[in-house]
Design a protein with these regions (language model features):
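N-terminal presequence-like segments and the immediate start of the first folded domain
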Residues: 1-60, 64-77, 83-217, 223-337, ...
Length: 412
């Protein structure tokens, strides 16, 4: 399918060092929007430490990107926000509410399905927020259906965001948390109950859209960092994936998991999801791909209605040990090679990627260089390939020693 890649031009924000990725990629009725940064044309951070100013910067950048395609923020069906807050958990909700009051200046009504999580950081010191999204155009945009199930949770302040959107046979499920209609966490201290509660919310979105768990193509697991069961010692992320297996009903979805902090104190996880209703959905399972952190019940990739979703790839041996410990570039190369091998199962290549997500683990002084290393490795592995891209610094990945993870969406 023909793609329209828009690279930054003129005075648009840019990464340092000439790293090139598309600001937007339009394909068919969808527009994939890169993580929008609070940077200038030389990659210098604007308004460092000022969350209100930075929030306006990234929304203005997203708005400008859409205007260039004769679109607007009201065309968004998905919006992901990664933000940084290093204060006490008890102050995190107030910080989010203050940030969101600025976001409310830009949210359309009805708004997109949205996920917002507290990341460890961004590629450059002083960055506090980035946003990415998916927008719809044409007949699909006109015929979209908002999904707001009865009995779902709600936010602690009034926002016009949506629990989900149905566009044809696609269902965008926004971030789900274990909360009630006032935004108050429920099942605090019970990871299994929180996880099942969230899947119940996801199930309601799917049901109201005429779909079911058998139509899931991707699940994103944002888990509380540095968390283990105090009795068994099992990592929260491993237990979340075990419970998630209860909801596999058809072709297994792909999974990407990474550690964050959560919106409200007492929450252990947030999940969002993508579903596509297609009776010919196919799991992609390359031979000898290597090890992974996801249970074998999940797919490496899923092909549904011409769209390819690849779960989080890491440099993991078949025995679960980490490859190339301490060597970020080697891990990044392995990860990108694995993306390519999964794509080959669908007769696709890295050049078919429309959205690439990078998850980086590193110390404060390392992260900027790690990000630029990932960009250089990408250019070596897939020259002249410019997908939309979002890089996030996360607290940790599912296995200690992993420094890098990537997942992607591709359309042939």
């Amino acid at each position: 399918m023909q793609k329209e890649n828009k690279l930054p031009v003129d005075d648009m924000w840019q990464w340092k060092g000439g790293a090139k990725f598309s600001n937007t990629v339009a394909v068919g009725d969808q527009v994939f929007i890169s993580g929008q940064q609070t940077l200038d044309k030389d990659g210098v951070v604007l308004n460092p430490g000022d969350i209100a100013a930075q929030t306006r910067n990234v929304f203005e950048n997203m708005k400008s990107s859409l205007v260039g395609l004769n679109m607007g923020l009201d065309d968004l069906v998905r919006l992901n926000t990664y933000y940084v807050f290093e204060g006490d958990d008890k102050d995190a909700t107030t910080f989010w509410e203050d940030m969101t009051r600025v976001r409310l200046e830009y949210f359309p009504d009805p708004g997109p399905a949205a996920t917002a999580v507290r990341a460890k950081g961004m590629p450059y010191e002083g960055q506090l927020i980035q946003i990415e999204g998916v927008a719809l155009r044409g007949e699909s945009r006109r015929c979209r259906q908002r999904i707001m199930p009865e009995g779902s949770w709600d936010w602690s302040i009034a926002v016009p965001l949506s629990q989900g959107w149905k566009i044809g046979n696609r269902i965008f499920v926004g971030g789900q948390i274990s909360a009630d209609k006032t935004g108050r966490p429920v099942h605090v201290g019970d990871l299994d109950a929180q996880t099942r509660n969230i899947y119940e919310y996801i199930g309601r979105v799917l049901s109201d859209a005429g779909a079911s768990f058998s139509d899931l193509t991707r699940v994103k697991i944002c888990f509380k960092y540095d968390s283990k069961d105090p009795n068994s010692g099992q990592a929260f992320v491993d237990r979340i994936m075990e419970v998630s297996k209860e909801y596999i009903k058809g072709t297994p979805p792909v999974v990407t998991a990474f550690a964050v902090d959560l919106l409200y104190p007492g929450l252990d996880l947030e999940l969002d999801a993508m579903a596509i209703v297609d009776q010919d959905t196919k799991a992609l399972a390359p031979n000898e791909l290597g090890g992974r952190y996801q249970p074998s019940e999940f797919s490496d990739g899923v092909l549904a209605d011409g769209e390819i979703y690849i779960g989080g790839q890491t440099a993991t041996e078949p025995d679960g040990s980490v490859m190339f410990p301490g060597d970020f570039s080697a891990q990044a190369n392995e990860v990108f090679q694995r993306l390519d091998r999964v794509l080959q199962e669908a007769d696709a290549t890295l050049k078919d990627i429309v959205k690439l997500n990078l998850f980086i683990v590193g110390q404060d002084a390392q992260v900027e260089e790690f990000f630029h290393q990932a960009c250089r490795v990408w250019t070596e592995v897939s020259p002249n390939s410019y997908p939309a891209m979002t890089p996030v610094r996360v607290h940790e990945l599912p296995k200690p020693g992993l420094l890098f993870q990537a997942d992607c969406i591709a359309i042939k």
